[in-house]
Design a protein with these regions (language model features):
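Bacterial N-terminal signal peptides that target proteins for export
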Residues: 3-15
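Bacterial N-terminal signal peptides
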Residues: 14-24
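Terminal presequence/propeptide segments associated with secretion/organelle targeting
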Residues: 25-376
Length: 376
């Protein structure tokens, strides 16, 4: 365990050194436009990624200010246009966090839309509210925001799943119904293991699971200041002080959907941690490794003698960790035995303490099911 702890310290040092260089290229001094300067009729542009890592722009027109319209205060009503918006059918899932500029000044992030519209109109979260996330060291209460009653809804954040099958994702959704997860099956891009610097308009992922299986949400970076970033413009899960893994993201394309268009992307290299998930967005830091729980899963099918071993890292969270770990195991079982139906399973697990001061906890059990041993 001492070797593991030394390796983790070494990894954090290397990661911080590497991304010190990346951040120096991505951070540029930007002037903010305060909300009291924003007037109806003003025009500007927004930035986002529609394919690959290339940042594109599209026009924005300010329609007004919605006082106390959002969970963190005022929101800015705007109309979006241009060839990109026409091509995508409006603001797509994954565009949340797209920075909006007027007269060269950063106004805020595209964050909310109206239900039952073509998504040409939406709300912008002011940048002043987003950068306050950097001053939240601990979990705190946030006033409730009833999106259902107002029909104003956060632009959905696509949940990209790589290495998981559809059955496992349906199982996950059933266990975490309150979050209304809508996972999208995806694959890896060719350069996913390469770290890229983030800038305003880049795609970014907040990941739960990393390794042989990956699961996380893709959105857009609003602002970068040295090693710190803010993104999304609205809460992801609203978990307050949290530790998600921060990753690069690659966008394959924007998929047009009758319900809502969405960015189809892959989760790339780990580049830092997301430590705030609150009303005005998410915030994180380059080069800082989020604590994670390493899990090794080995499954052997006695009928076919097929064996698979998967290794993942899962975020530390009292509510999410057990479900994410169980989903990862369930997925590995599904893919190894490659069938549904009855059977018998012998299950062994070993838990090791992080600091190595406690003895390993090992348990064995046997399960039988006539219907579906996978879910047992």
């Amino acid at each position: 365990m001492n070797k593991i702890r030394k390796f983790r310290r070494f990894a954090r040092t290397v990661m911080a050194a590497a991304f010190c260089c990346l951040a120096s290229f991505s951070a540029m001094a930007e002037t903010f436009m305060q909300i009291n300067e924003v007037q109806p009729g003003m025009t500007g542009y927004a930035k986002t990624v529609a394919h690959g890592r290339d940042i594109e722009t599209f026009p924005v027109e300010i329609l007004g200010i919605m006082k106390n319209g959002g969970p963190s205060g005022d929101l800015i009503l705007a109309r979006f246009s241009g060839p990109l918006i026409e091509e995508t059918g409006g603001i797509a899932q994954g565009m949340s966090g797209s920075p909006v500029y007027i007269d060269g000044k950063l106004v805020g992030a595209i964050a909310y839309g109206w239900s039952f519209t073509k998504s040409r109109m939406g709300m912008i979260t002011p940048i002043a509210d987003m950068v306050k996330l950097w001053n939240n060291p601990t979990r705190e209460e946030i006033p409730d925001f009833n999106a259902r009653e107002t029909q104003l809804i956060p632009i959905a954040t696509p949940l990209m799943a790589s290495g998981f099958d559809g059955v496992s994702m349906e199982w996950l959704k059933g266990k975490l119904k309150s979050y209304n997860f809508q996972p999208v099956d995806t694959a890896s891009a060719g350069d996913d293991d390469t770290a890229f610097p983030l800038q305003a308009g880049s795609s970014v992922a907040a990941a739960f699971v990393d390794g042989d299986m990956r699961l996380g949400a893709i959105g857009t970076v609003t602002y970068v200041d040295d090693n710190n970033i803010v993104a999304f413009g609205h809460p992801f899960l609203k978990r307050g002080s949290i530790n998600y893994f921060m990753h690069n993201a690659y966008i394959f394309t924007i998929v047009n959907n009758l319900d809502s268009s969405f960015k189809l992307g892959s989760i790339g290299a780990e580049i830092g941690k997301i430590d705030q998930d609150r009303g005005s967005g998410i915030a994180g830091e380059y080069g800082m490794t989020a604590p994670g729980i390493p899990v090794t899963i080995t499954v052997t099918d006695r009928d076919t003698q097929r064996l698979q071993t998967k290794r993942v890292k899962i975020i530390e969270d009292n509510e999410l960790t057990p479900v994410l770990a169980a989903t990862s195991v369930y997925n590995t079982v599904n893919k190894t035995i490659d069938r549904r139906g009855g059977g018998t399973a012998t299950f062994t697990y070993k838990i090791r303490s992080a600091d190595g001061t406690e003895k390993d906890i090992t348990r064995h059990n046997m399960y039988y099911s006539e219907d579906n041993i996978n879910e047992k």
